């Protein structure tokens, strides 16, 4: 592997600009070689002056890079030493409190943890939190050690290449005189901190069991994503292949059934609505797998952003596997419905069995089938539903945003419950989902729960914004963002009034609803592009209409995403126009089935650029890991700390004007330190790669 590729694969993305600019040095050397005057047509003195002038410029650039690296390394080392001292103090306090509690326990009857006071519970909990805190700190030390090794190797490689191209030894001399005596290379305190951390965790937190301690401190491999196990790859191919084949079969079988029942007033929409939500979930999981793959390839650290455990999180292949497996079950269930007369399973039992399995798969308490990931999702869903009572983090409002694009899933779930409760004829031995057209209770707004369900995702985000305003006391962006979600309430209210009224007043509600939709679409579109994606930056330079720094390689991706977002944000105009002009429910039903998958696709595109913007904010603050204390802070201190961390320009523009755009909350009272590290943290031996080709 060439060192350029090796460096690109092993750097910490949030510190990218602080590494040696190896590729720029290579271009500088090759450009000088190509532009050098030929000794055959130019006198020797001119050639010597050319090379002398170039070398002066080259070594000046090397000095600037070396100064940058020394400064950054010194800052991070000082930060690591402060954190280590803080963790030592917190560990000592927790151990003292635990010993005091143990002595006091000897004077009274033994009590279970359920009978302990809140203060005593915190003491027991702090030991667990400290284990996670030291694991997080250890990962940050490994990051810094890799930074040290990669930069030294980069200088050695580029100076060696310099000497080879120009047939001199001045590069090696400069390395000995400057690089090998540079503080970032000669300072061995980082190695000492790593050793002391391992010893402290072994003796104080793991009872002297070094193997257990090192297992806790284990770091995932650095660099490109590791290949998935062979069996996982096999299952992905199997499930996805079977899913594609079964999907084609479902389409053909569905068309045949429609032809058979054509003209007999059979209503197939209950069946479509019941299975539509399941398809949207499968589509969402599959596209999320593509998101994950794209983030890894582009160096967007989604593991840090979502505060996942870098030692154990789902890769794109795992998401493809889950989506493919659930997709196969979805297709089998539909085929069982379509050919119910040939099976022993009543037709109405198939959807119940399918979604019952989906639900059991999610809440399965056994530690199998991605238990930790499922538990993380359930905990996140709970935090979304109870948003006003918790501090809101990125993962919380990201999931709530996904629910806004999956609102049809919630509405179809409500429809299914209503249909099975009020419309399905359970007295029929075979059940019935292909129903004759007639009065429908569940799909009309006369059943008022639908309007409430449609407002729920927007309500979750609305109260999250209010909670963030309460925590930060910043009207912008939180109250302005809450106003964006409040427009959804007006859209739903007037849509319900439009559908439940007749006569002239019906059109009054229609016009008000259209006005509300236009406001909502413009509001959300501008927020997507400017706030969530960070585009239309005045300092974009050559990245016209974008931002100063972009992660994805082609500008066309951004322009296509802007056009796509504009089109799909206003896609509601098509079904509304056709419904008003033709007043044909079948047209509304067809478009109501086509547009939700497109909205899921829009959210898939949105995810790429939303996390890119968050990643660049982390880069601006060189925030590769979170500096989180185990000791609880009061509300004022925590808010002040968040405001310091939330400065969008970060360390790059410390002396410039502060620009508060967005709040990124993090809980210091119950730290999840091991889940906040980078996926690319590891201690590696920098191999002697050769790219002299």
Curated annotation (Swiss-Prot):
Keywords: Cell membrane, Membrane, Transmembrane, Transmembrane helix. GO terms for biological process: cellular response to phosphate starvation; intracellular phosphate ion homeostasis; macrophage differentiation; microglia differentiation; phosphate ion transmembrane transport; phosphate ion transport; skeletal system development. Residues 257-267, 340-342, 427-477, 528-560 are extracellular. Residues 157-164 are annotated as: Important for inositol polyphosphate binding. This is Xenotropic and polytropic retrovirus receptor 1 homolog. It is found in: Cell membrane. The SPX domain has high affinity for inositol polyphosphates, such as myo-inositol hexakisphosphate and 5-diphospho-myo-inositol pentakisphosphate (5-InsP7). Its affinity for inorganic phosphate is tow to three orders of magnitude lower. InterPro entries: EXS_C, SPX_dom. Residues 441-642 form the EXS domain. One of its GO terms (cellular component) is plasma membrane. The chain crosses the membrane at residues 236-256, 268-288, 319-339, 343-363, 406-426, 478-498, 507-527, 561-581. It comes from the Eukaryota. It is a multi-pass membrane protein. Its main location: membrane. It holds the Pfam family EXS. PROSITE patterns: EXS, SPX. Residues 1-235, 289-318, 364-405, 499-506, 582-693 are cytoplasmic. The record marks 22, 26 as: Important for inositol polyphosphate binding. Belongs to the SYG1 (TC 2.A.94) family. GO terms for molecular function: efflux transmembrane transporter activity; inositol hexakisphosphate binding; phosphate transmembrane transporter activity.
């Amino acid at each position: 592997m060439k060192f350029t590729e090796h460096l690109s694969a092993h750097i910490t993305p949030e510190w990218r600009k602080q590494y040696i600019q190896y590729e720029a040095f290579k271009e500088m050397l090759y450009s000088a070689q190509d532009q050098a005057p030929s000794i055959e047509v130019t006198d020797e003195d001119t050639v010597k002056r050319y090379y002398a002038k170039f070398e002066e410029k080259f070594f000046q650039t090397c000095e600037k890079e070396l100064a940058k690296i020394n400064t950054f390394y010194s800052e991070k080392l000082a930060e690591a030493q402060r954190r280590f001292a803080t963790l030592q103090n917190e560990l000592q306090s927790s151990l003292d409190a635990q010993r005091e509690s143990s002595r006091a326990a000897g004077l009274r009857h033994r009590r279970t943890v359920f009978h302990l006071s809140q203060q005593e519970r915190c003491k027991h909990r702090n030991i667990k939190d400290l284990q996670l805190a030291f694991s997080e700190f250890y990962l940050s030390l490994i990051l810094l050690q890799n930074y040290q090794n990669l930069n030294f190797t980069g200088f050695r490689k580029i100076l060696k290449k310099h000497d080879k191209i120009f047939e001199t030894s001045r590069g090696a001399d400069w390395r000995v005189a400057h690089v090998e005596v540079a503080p970032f290379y000669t300072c061995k305190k980082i190695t000492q901190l790593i050793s002391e951390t391992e010893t402290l965790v072994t003796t104080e937190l793991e009872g002297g069991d070094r193997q257990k301690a090192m297992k806790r401190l284990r770091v995932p491999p650095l660099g490109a994503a590791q290949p998935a196990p062979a069996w996982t790859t096999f299952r992905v191919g199997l499930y996805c292949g079977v899913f594609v084949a079964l999907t084609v079969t479902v389409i053909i079988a569905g068309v045949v059934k429609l032809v058979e029942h054509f003209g007999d007033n059979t209503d197939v929409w209950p069946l479509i609505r019941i299975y539509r939500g399941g398809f949207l979930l499968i589509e969402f999981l599959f596209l999320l797998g593509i998101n994950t793959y794209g983030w890894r390839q582009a160096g967007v650290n989604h593991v840090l952003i979502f505060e996942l455990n870098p030692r154990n999180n789902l890769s794109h292949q795992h998401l493809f596997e889950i989506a493919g497996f659930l997709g196969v079950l979805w297709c089998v269930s539909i085929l069982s419905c379509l050919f119910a007369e040939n099976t022993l399973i009543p037709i109405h039992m198939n959807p119940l069995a399918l979604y019952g399995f989906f639900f059991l798969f999610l809440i399965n308490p056994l530690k199998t089938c991605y238990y930790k990931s499922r538990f993380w999702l359930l905990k996140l869903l709970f935090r979304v539903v109870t948003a006003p009572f918790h501090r809101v983090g990125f993962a919380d409002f990201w999931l709530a945003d996904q629910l806004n694009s999956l609102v049809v899933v919630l509405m179809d779930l409500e429809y299914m419950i209503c249909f099975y409760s009020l419309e399905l004829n359970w007295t029929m031995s075979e059940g019935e989902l292909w129903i004759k057209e007639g009065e429908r209770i569940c799909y009309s707004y006369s059943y008022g729960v639908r309007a409430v369900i449609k407002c729920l995702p927007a309500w979750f985000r609305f109260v999250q914004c209010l909670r963030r305003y309460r925590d930060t006391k910043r009207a912008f962006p939180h109250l302005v963002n809450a106003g964006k979600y409040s427009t959804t309430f007006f859209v739903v209210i007037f849509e319900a009034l439009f559908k439940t009224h007749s006569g002239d007043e019906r059109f009054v509600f229609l016009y008000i609803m259209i006005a509300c939709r236009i406001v909502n679409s413009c509001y959300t579109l501008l927020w997507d592009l400017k706030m969530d994606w960070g585009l239309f930056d005045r300092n974009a330079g050559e990245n016209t209409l974008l931002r100063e720094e972009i992660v994805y390689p082609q500008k066309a991706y951004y322009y296509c995403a802007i056009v796509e977002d504009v089109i799909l944000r206003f896609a509601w105009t098509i079904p509304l126009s056709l419904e008003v002009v033709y007043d044909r429910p079948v047209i509304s039903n067809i478009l109501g089935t086509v547009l939700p998958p497109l909205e899921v696709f829009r959210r898939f595109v949105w995810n790429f650029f939303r996390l890119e913007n968050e990643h660049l904010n982390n880069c601006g603050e060189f925030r590769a890991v979170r500096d989180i204390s185990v000791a609880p802070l009061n509300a004022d201190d925590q808010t002040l700390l968040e405001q310091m961390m939330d400065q969008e320009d970060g360390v790059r523009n410390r002396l410039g004007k502060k620009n508060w755009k967005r709040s990124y909350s993090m809980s210091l009272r119950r730290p999840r330190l091991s889940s906040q590290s980078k996926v690319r943290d590891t201690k590696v031996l920098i191999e002697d790669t050769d790219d002299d080709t």
